[in-house]
Amino acid sequence: MKYRLALTAYRLKVAVLVSSYDHCLADLLYRQHSGELSCEIPLIISNHTNVHRLPEFYGVAFHPTTDAKDKGDAEQRIVALLGQHEIDLVILARYMQILSSEFVQQFPWRIINIHHSFLPAFVGAKSYQQAFERGVKLIGATSHYVYRCAR
């Protein structure tokens, strides 16, 4: 068993990775700004440029990876940014990219994914469509630690 103790006065530094849908990001930033979420969010990284307005509004550093040569280059940039900002925890807020095993292994038990459906019932990017096709009347979200790559 592994555990880690931390002072409660210490506020975790959290980076948020997001793709083009920014409603999850908006909620996290609002809750942090209002004091409901006790952490710092000094960094937002996206594989799209259209989400830049929220970080600008909240005064948070925004770094798009849209000019990366490939997935490996994008992940290297992300790792560098996480190190520069001394990030403790990474939140994937509708980040629609599959992270490599190498990336995940660099941040053991420090990545939380917010998935836009009830797992394990609806896996993947089209979970709303899957729920609709099954006649589901109530949808929600699931969050979980990312500790290994399924593929």
PLM segments and residue spans:
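One-carbon transfer enzymes
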Residues: 1-151
